[in-house]
Regions:
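TOPRIM fold recognition
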Residues: 22, 34-170
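Acidic, glycine-rich catalytic loops of TOPRIM or P-loop NTPase phosphate-binding modules used
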Residues: 4-48
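Short, Lys/Arg-enriched, disordered terminal segments
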Residues: 1-4, 170
Length: 170
């Protein structure tokens, strides 16, 4: 069973998100290293944030930047010596047991998603394939930049109902 966290897990790159999504059911936001978009910061403000960044020097610099922008963030740090897969020393190279052990204290018993939106609804509402409409919805809900898949996940994680979504589109 996947771990559901009481907050949004923030990681550096897509490889980290892909690796962790096999074990964590919560929303995972990728900050793309030092190039953290303002829309991502805006989306994360006011939410429970769990920072899980690479234990290298670059990861520490990104952590420092995010902590200054999002001061109530929870910092989860992995021992660099536990990252033994391959030559890189990032979250995606760490042993999953070590990561889950560190994240377990932020876990909740069940998934809190109450949204009634299905992915097929996004197709019917023309949110998949219509970048302008998707951007309008994302801007109104302060969801940051989203492709169709990310929009779906963020709507679910923010418990946006189908009725609310239809009202925004009108």
């Amino acid at each position: 069973m996947k771990l559901f966290l009481d907050g949004i897990l923030v990681v550096e790159g897509k490889e980290d998100a892909s690796y962790l999504s096999n074990y964590v059911a919560s929303e995972i936001v990728v900050v793309n290293g030092f190039e953290i978009p303002d829309t991502t910061i805006s989306y994360l403000k006011g939410k429970q944030i769990i920072l899980l960044l690479d234990p290298d020097e670059a990861g520490q610099e990104i952590r420092k930047k995010l902590n200054s922008l999002l001061p109530n963030s929870i910092n989860v740090e992995i021992d660099i010596n536990k990252c033994t897969r391959g030559f890189k020393k990032g979250v995606a190279e760490c042993e999953i047991d070590e990561i889950l052990h560190k994240l377990k204290i932020y876990a909740v018993n069940k998934n809190k998603i109450d949204s009634d939106i299905k992915q097929s609804d996004l197709y019917q509402l023309d949110l998949i394939g219509n970048r302008e409409l998707r951007k309008k919805v994302c801007d109104k809900l302060n969801l940051g930049n989203c492709n169709g898949k990310t929009l779906y996940r963020r709507l679910l994680n923010n418990n946006i109902s189908l009725e609310q979504l239809c009202e925004i589109i009108k």
